[in-house]
Amino acid sequence: MAIPVIDFSKLDGKERAETMARIANGCEEWGFFQLVNHGIPVELLERVKKVSSECYKLREERFEGSKPVQLLDTLVKEGDGQRLDNVDWEDVFVLQDDNEWPSNPPDFEETMKEYREEIRKLAEKMMEVMDENLGFEKGCIKKAFSGDGQHPPFFGTKVSHYPPCPRLDLVKGLRAHTDAGGVILLFQDDQVGGLQMLKDGRWIDVQPLADAIVINTGDQIEVLSNGRYKSAWHRVLATSHGNRRSIASFYNPSLKATIAPAAGAATEEAAPPALYPKFLFGDYMDVYAKQKYEPKEPRFEAVRAI
């Protein structure tokens, strides 16, 4: 079993209807799919690989003294059979428009700004496809994420590396969770695997595919679609060989945006009852920060009570 791979270039051709249907299936049945021929230049993706790898090499010594490494060393020395269940074997930093970026390598900032602009455009195009498939007005999801245009949506890029791990039996690369926000676009390593998503009780590998962009839907897309699209559990397994690169961009609501099931296109049938509460996304994030690695349903109930 493998997650869907969709040729995004066919969206603008004779196979548009079939491509729209495949994306709908990816959102409804999987919550994960891979896009090829998505429009981001391969030359840019090659530069992103280069600068992110060079950046990690400059940070590698810092990771060797990090909390996960120290905790694992202590656990191995004590040898009491416990696992590291509260940390991830991951070196990570987040890029936003207004925060401090690494100054080295010298071309890191220019390259990543160019990439973020391209991946943001792809995210917004994907949201318009979701709008159409769900029967929403064009721009509905983006408008909801911006609080009816009052606040800019959040757009952050998480740059991660998963170094080789000496004890795979004791720690995960990234613990299982669903993503809190909207649409997530991942440019993952095309050599070193490890990403898995949960479907029908089975963990499925998200196979490395050169120059593809992995799309997954977050909790807020589940709410806006009133459960038609589900956020999927996923995790990253640590590996004993290779250094896995992972660049995930998150197109999320503003913390001030109010999220609730959206009204679909007008039909003769009565709208289904809302299965999710109406809430402020900032309140949801407060709950998520404490319950990220726990089932999502209690999070929805918690914000219902606020």
Swiss-Prot record:
- Annotated pathway, please? Alkene biosynthesis; ethylene biosynthesis via S-adenosyl-L-methionine; ethylene from S-adenosyl-L-methionine: step 2/2
Q: Which UniProt keywords apply?
A: Ethylene biosynthesis, Fruit ripening, Iron, Metal-binding, Oxidoreductase, Vitamin C
Identify the enzyme class: oxidoreductase
Q: What is its EC number?
A: 1.14.17.4
Q: Which GO terms describe its molecular function?
A: 1-aminocyclopropane-1-carboxylate oxidase activity; L-ascorbic acid binding; metal ion binding
Q: Which Pfam families match?
A: 2OG-FeII_Oxy, DIOX_N
Q: Give the similarity note.
A: Belongs to the iron/ascorbate-dependent oxidoreductase family.
User: What name does UniProt use for this protein?
Assistant: 1-aminocyclopropane-1-carboxylate oxidase
Organism per entry: Musa acuminata
Q: Provide the gene name from the record.
A: MAO1B
